[in-house]
Amino acid sequence: MTRAERAAALVEALPRVYPDAHCELDFENPLQLLVATILSAQCTDKRVNLVTKELFRVCRTARDYAEIAPAKLEKLVQSTGFFRAKARNIQACCAALVAHHGGDVPNSMEALTALAGVGRKTANVVLGNVFGLSEGVVVDTHVQRLSTRLGLTKNKTPEKIERDLMKLLPREFWTLFSHWLIWHGRRRGFASLPG
């Protein structure tokens, strides 16, 4: 079976197994998803959701994040790990949102990746799940591991894996494909093709 055939088989099988696959970060607006995704680096979605429950009560706007005392923000996000860097990135990101985007989250890859703490993965999460735009494939640890095990790529870096997946998958499945593999990785923990 070629890589293209494997990708096609997955696009056919995974929606039957995971028809409800979606982003498991809790959010109500683009800013909340942006902040939650920054916090999700090296952290579980479950932990992030516990943290953001309180964080989203304290900070409601980009200006709130930009102006909160750094020590207070660090304390709120401490349990997500790497909390000083994450707090610093969130504040710088939100200050840029206020200064350059009227406090709103932009809906382009270029504008998002220009923000502190926002790489392609975070931008793809926001674009795909808030704005319905498929600019790329989210490559987290599950997608990275399973794409290799399922023979979709031989590459090891997220950027190269993303490029390989974008070549193999129809654009309309880029966002969903990540959700399917993430759900598969979290629920099954192994990379057999679902039947």
Indicate residue ranges for each PLM-predicted region.
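Catalytic cores of DNA base-excision repair glycosylases
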Residues: 2-195
